[in-house]
Amino acid sequence: MIQALLVAICLAVFPYQGSSIILESGNVNDYEVVYPQKVPALSKGGVQNPQPETKYEDTMQYEFHVNGEPVVLHLERNKGLFSEDYTETHYAPDGREITTSSPVQDHCYYHGYIQNEADSSAVISACDGLKGHFKHQGETYFIEPLELSDSEAHAIYKDENVEEEEEIPKICGVTQTTWESDEPIEKSSQLTNTPEQDRYLQAKKYIEFYVVVDNVMYRKYTGKLHVITRRVYEMVNALNTMYRRLNFHIALIGLEIWSNGNEINVQSDVQATLDLFGEWRENKLLPRKRNDNAQLLTSTEFNGTTTGLGYIGSLCSPKKSVAVVQDHSKSTSMVAITMAHQMGHNLGMNDDRASCTCGSNKCIMSTKYYESLSEFSSCSVQEHREYLLRDRPQCILNKPSRKAIVTPPVCGNYFVERGEECDCGSPEDCQNTCCDAATCKLQHEAQCDSGECCEKCKFKGAGAECRAAKNDCDFPELCTGRSAKCPKDSFQRNGHPCQNNQGYCYNGTCPTLTNQCATLWGPGAKMSPGLCFMLNWNARSCGLCRKENGRKILCAAKDVKCGRLFCKKKNSMICHCPPPSKDPNYGMVAPGTKCGVKKVCRNRQCVKV
């Protein structure tokens, strides 16, 4: 008993080395076991500072050893990780959209640094122990809890000690760039900038970031929503740190999990997937949830060794401010680097060339991904700067939440902060006649300075259209006469006839078999004759209603138009089966589709409206 106690005491005080272990981030062949000790935060008078009643503290300190030397890790909660209007969306088995909007305040995601080290940084989640990475004496170390009986044991290791999951390095899928040679980029002289350009460059910028997790990734983590959300939070927390040096703040405004099947055809052709995701963002996502940039996370393997793709210089574009990223590693840090790389393309950066350098040996925009990447190269910084001055994207000047402000508000920095009614820049630059640039207050008798329902500094009259109806199932939105904002999008009730009685409204759309055939096969494709749909009742055909545990379930006779979608194309068979796909919903009749008189498809059954 005494001997066991002495061993436990030694382990708590002196770290020990390990040769090989399987951790959450992968197989590690050399690591150090440490026991981080929490250090109470003291005020100047030596009295412990009281903090509000929360599960996770705003600031924390931990002491442990690295290579035998003591270090103190300072952590500060990333209060701006979530936008004030952050939402989470997933889908019920019957296709219903389920969105929750409770604010995430008491979370466990931190940024930090090592005490007494100028060039130090840390990205840590403290949900169950300490997990993440920190920079110490110029090297990147990773830390995560060990699954031992002693819950305080942690492993510390370097990225070179993580065994590669595959021999082939992961690369970016971008092949077209905006540079023409491999010559080093010459820095533009600051003297060529106007004062207005300098103020724009220096203004803090914000990206309201929306993440979509596809159905393949959802199933990879066996449908455990809490596991997926925590994984995404860790990635975005790391992403935030990487963009701090560019004066950008990434705020997560929404997380959507396609739990009931993919909303687009996610395929191994990464360019096709990117194009479809961009169209989905423009046509489906933006009408219901504003965001500046969106990324699709998928566990689908793209062709070759590609792990992601993003449009170059496209931020704020409704269709092209997007990227797709493969969840290609157990390590959230590794996937976060891929996310940062693809977002870099949206922000005007190309893949680095041989002449590009950064403080570390490997830069974020390198064509190959490494776990210790944390800096943008000189090329990336210059390309990004030139893109900002050339395109002047405006969506990044809108701060996601007034309540999230940590620093005092600054009048004249182009975004409205606590206590301000407007902000149009400095008095010299302001071109908004509704706003007093000196005070950041509205001019006398002005009611507003911007918004869909603001015109000549006054609210538009009640009844003025501010958003046109998109289709038969959408209502036009009208100004109230009391606000500059356009009211939230509203839809016709589900079940209302649409498109000359070809369909019934469903969540703001009018799904019909003909439209779905055109989407699947291209213009000119039409719904097959009703006889073809009887194949969904025939065990020997490609028809079915759904699959359960890999077993094909046929439709009942009354439900045949709610199973497999059959279309006819020019010069083709009349009963044309969709091509095979790993996505269980690909080529299936969409929920809400008309399947009879006053009947629609719901959960693969034809039911009354």
Curated annotation (Swiss-Prot):
Name of the protein described by the UniProt record: Snake venom metalloproteinase-disintegrin-like mocarhagin
Main location: secreted
Subcellular location: Secreted
Keywords in alphabetical order: Calcium, Cell adhesion impairing toxin, Disulfide bond, Glycoprotein, Hemostasis impairing toxin, Hydrolase, Metal-binding, Metalloprotease, Platelet aggregation inhibiting toxin, Protease, Secreted, Signal, Toxin, Zinc, Zymogen
The enzyme's E.C. designation: 3.4.24.-
Record flagged with keyword Glycoprotein: yes
Propeptide: 21-191
Residues binding Zn(2+), per UniProt: H341, H345
Enzyme class of the recorded protein, top EC level: hydrolase
InterPro entries: ADAM_Cys-rich (IPR006586), Disintegrin_CS (IPR018358), Disintegrin_dom (IPR001762), Disintegrin_dom_sf (IPR036436), MetalloPept_cat_dom_sf (IPR024079), Peptidase_M12B (IPR001590), Peptidase_M12B_N (IPR002870), Reprolysin_adamalysin (IPR034027)
Gene Ontology terms for molecular function: metalloendopeptidase activity; peptidase activity; toxin activity; zinc ion binding
Residues binding Ca(2+) 1: E208, D292, C395, N398
Record text on activity regulation: Inhibited by EDTA and diisopropyl fluorophosphate (DFP). Also inhibited by an excess of zinc or calcium ions.
Subunit structure: Monomer.
Glycosylation site residues: N303, N507
